[in-house]
Amino acid sequence: MAAAIGVRGRFELLSCSGPGWLISLSALLSVVARGALATTHWVVTEDGKIQQQVDSPMNLKHPHDLVILMRQETTVNYLKELEKQLVAQKIHIEENEDRDTGLEQRHNKEDPDCIKAKVPLGDLDLYDGTYITLESKDVRPEDFIDTESPVPPDPEQPDCTKILELPYSIHAFQHLRGVQERVNLSAPLLPKEDPIFTYLSKRLGRSIDDIGHLIHEGLQKNSSSWVLYNLASFYWRIKNEPYQVVECTMRALHFSSRHNKDIALVNLANVLHRAHFSADAAVVVHAALDDSAFFTSYYTLGNIYAMLGEYNHSVLCYDHALQAKPGFEQAIKRKHAVLCQQKLEQKLEAQHRSLQRTLNELKEYQKQHDHYLRQQEILEKHKLIQEEQILRNIIHETQMAKEAQLGNHQICRLVNQQHSLHCQWDQPVRYHRGDIFENVDYVQFGDDSSTSSMMSVNFDVPTNQSDVSESVRSSPVAHSVLWVWGRDSDAYRDKQHILWPKRADCTDSYPRVPLGGELPTYFLPPENKGLRIHELTSDDYSSEEEAQTPDCSITDFRKSHTLSYLVKELEVRMDLKAKIPDDHARKILLSRIKNYTIPEEEIGSFLFHAINKPNAPVWLILNEAGLYWRAVGNSTFAIACLQRALNLAPVQYQDIPLVNLANLLIHYGLHLDATKLLLQALAVNSSEPLTFLSLGNAYLALKNVSGALEAFRQALKLTTRCPECESSLKLIRCMQFYPFLYNITSSVCSGHCHEKTLDNSHDKQKYFAKPQSLDAAEEEPSRHGADEDPVLSVENAGRDSDALRLESTVVEESNGSDEVEKSEETKMSEEILALVDEFQQAWPLEGLGGTLEMKGRRLDLQGIRVLKKGPQDGVAKSSCYGDCRSEDDEATEWITFQVKRVKKPKGDHKKPPGKKVEASQAENGQRYQANLEITGPKVASPGPQEKKRDYQSMGWPSPDECLKLRWVELTAIVSTWLAVSSKNIDITEHIDFATPIQQPAMEPLCNGNLPTSMHTLDHLHGVSNRASLHYTGESQLTEVLQNLGKDQYPQQSLEQIGTRIAKVLEKNQTSWVLSSMAALYWRVKGQGKKAIDCLRQALHYAPHQMKDVPLISLANILHNAKLWNDAVVVATMAVEIAPHFAVNHFTLGNVYVAMEEFEKALVWYESTLKLQPEFVPAKNRIQTIQCHLMLKKGRRSP
């Protein structure tokens, strides 16, 4: 069996002679498979010989024509890709073709509503006659006509037009088309079982003709009686004269009181409905329901809506009828028939769309197939005929045999106990695996300039390797993780149990995550900003005065429109009416007075006089008054003081009252409201650790542990001095070091998150509403200890002293298992996993090389130094890293993993710090046996020269990694959505999620005829021709739509969300927020035109800085419709408006991928990671594109 291979280098090609060299050159330029035969130019035969294919497309009629050769290569590559596409397209069509021919019959047999209805909707009489009796209004017909009066042989009929000439009446519904055309109303035959036939006869005991005469006599005597006109309309309904029914009904409506109009309205609706003016009939019945809610009206309206195809409204009307009259059989049967018909139509519509899509795909497949055949003809036109190829192959084989006899080979020697093979030149090495080559681990070419690994990396590290520890001296230095809140490591020399707590300490101090009421509250002092309140003296007030309390209402109130919305709801919250003193606030208050003997009343007097005679900015004194009322427990006064302080404070200091107000809310258990204030405070100033600590406490109370950890991590990164923060330090470190102790097994945000993102990563944007403001005040930690080596010591108590072994046993994540591993193994692996996040935050990534994977967790590292000393040597059991002392170097071993072929730059003979290639390890004769199973770590391929690997640049994977990676399907459309909450907009303020829905379902419709403006982008083809888009919809956004407002209200159905959006949009068509929500609804529904109508409306009314929200939706629709050039224009506009949102960059990258402009896509995915370093979809797509480009180029080059 022949196997396809590539050509190693051009030196082998140059050694050929005769006409075969040009054929070999063609193989050099095209190693890819031929599309038609799926073969390469070169093959390896069963006896190990390399020869060209007999029927190769690269054997040309004119081998000297380089241009044709290059075109042939392009055609071969193109045909191969085209064939793959055709095969995949055909498989896709066959798999998705709808072959269900018995859909309707099976639906009628299996659907529960169809079974209950027993008959289809089409077999039911939806014109079923209904009426409301006069007796239901306490009216007796006998009181209005003389039943004892004799009737002449030729009785008269009650012609209402002759009784009274009715002027125009606003009550008679003369604006309806059915009423205006009453002369031409059709009159289908009434069924004999229609109940209207028996109503008058049974009641009055006379024939219908006699009753008509009596009604005529009554109208002659009283031409303004609404009862007689209603009786006349009943008479004409029995006679099946719709014109007369309408005339009598109009007069009955004219003279009826409002409460009695429904009798005439139901009569009018029945006639209009039977005459096929069902829409007018629905209007009339709705008017009847406005006056009185009889079940007859609901039942009639249900029939009308069923006939109109408004199935949701019909079912709702039947439900109301059943509520008014439970067990009403006709309503029950029709309700189930309507539901049965509705689901059948939905299935048939879906089948129709599927068949239409299949038809379009078949047409496209036929076009591609015809194009493929044309390209195949072009390929065959330049190819050499098969007989000529065979002749040239014979000549080539003869030449190869001559060269083999002349010694065209190289001699390689085994070194290092036959574990490595050293070859002089970088040429292909041919040998059979076995015999003396069985133990060859890697091959070295030339002067150690290139190595190629031939084994998987599994190490058991002996502890007596002195040469390995030599590399420690040149290892990189990490940032100091002991630089906390402006204090270096010496300041924590006596507090190691706080900064580096042991597991036992954490178990004793914090056996669980503290509850909301157990967390401390804080006070952000103005002194942190360099502000100070002067002390009061006895001259400022008289101590003999009656004790006063600070009254914040006497100050001038200057409202800040920018922030008032944050606190306007707090004034009416019932949660804040209780009096709950805050002990933490009392301690802070007394510490600020610096006199614990002063009673609270005297402190209140201090503040009262300070407000009346301010010797400092008033907002500072109001801030102190807020602390006073917090300590006392009067939340109403505290909010008043802090609200006024917020409105009077300069913009750059507004975070002080915001943070203090948020801590008041935390004390009262309003943690979600507190997070909103804290996020706004971070937008003002992100350099205060107390703000992050307060936010972390709020997230802990909300069960958002991952968000709390992120907030705590941000607090630890700040260099601002914060003595008040140290009380929380031990809790933070315990949660970071021992996540399993608190069941923190993943970084998924499980509580209240303010941003929904596309991944489960530690991303600031996930927890903080304004991520761009978080890094504004971060400073670089001190360079103290910059010459020390980074050390990661892993606890090794109770292990073999002769061989340190890195165990890969960890506790399973989130699988609900109660299985407990061995205590030592669990503790060690738990520490390693707990330090993953700490390494990523504190170590510079250029100091790391590779990836250690354990149970799905990845730890980037260059090497691990393991302390050989045990507890008997006085070394602490806890792990140390970062700024460990240099004297530990003598007691450490470096374990460095290298697993791939690595090319070194020419002339650079230095080994990179902390890294050892396998060649140097092999020359020392130190080979380790496979005892530790590690899937990594793997050193990334260098990529471009001098480009360091960090979160902004992932580096390029090696070919081996590409083969193992799970590639992303780049052709799949990934939908993105930029939430309005990213613009600090609360969607619950625009859409009412609380009020129950009483009316029938609605859909949000935007103005499709909105005039063209400079904002509506009508110059784009996709927008101007939106009615003809081939848009397949984005059902994957359904959950996003249903979860709108989920933080405060339960999840709702798609129809409910659409109805709520429609209700508010109907009242406010100029709201860009509502238009964007309506566009999201239509994106889920798959209605591209209606979605773009709403987006045009949103773009027209949205402020410039908000336009990226509708632009991202528009870019997704155009991307889905394959209008990629338009999508690029729109997505680029979104990036220019809001370059700080990662989703905008990611969307633009997706469009470039669809256009197969992979280099541009890489640029935008890289910029996505700069904004959101752990965004997994962007990382996966970068790796897939890199592998695609690299392997594609690899096929083209030797």
Curated annotation (Swiss-Prot):
The gene is Ttc17. It is found in: Cytoplasm; Cell membrane; Cytoplasm, Cytoskeleton. TPR repeats lie at residues 295-328, 619-652, 689-722, 1071-1105, 1108-1141, 1142-1175. Expressed in germ cells as well as in somatic cells of the testis (at protein level). Ubiquitous. Residues 771-825, 903-924 are annotated as: Disordered. Residues 340-382 form a coiled coil. Plays a role in primary ciliogenesis by modulating actin polymerization. This is Tetratricopeptide repeat protein 17.
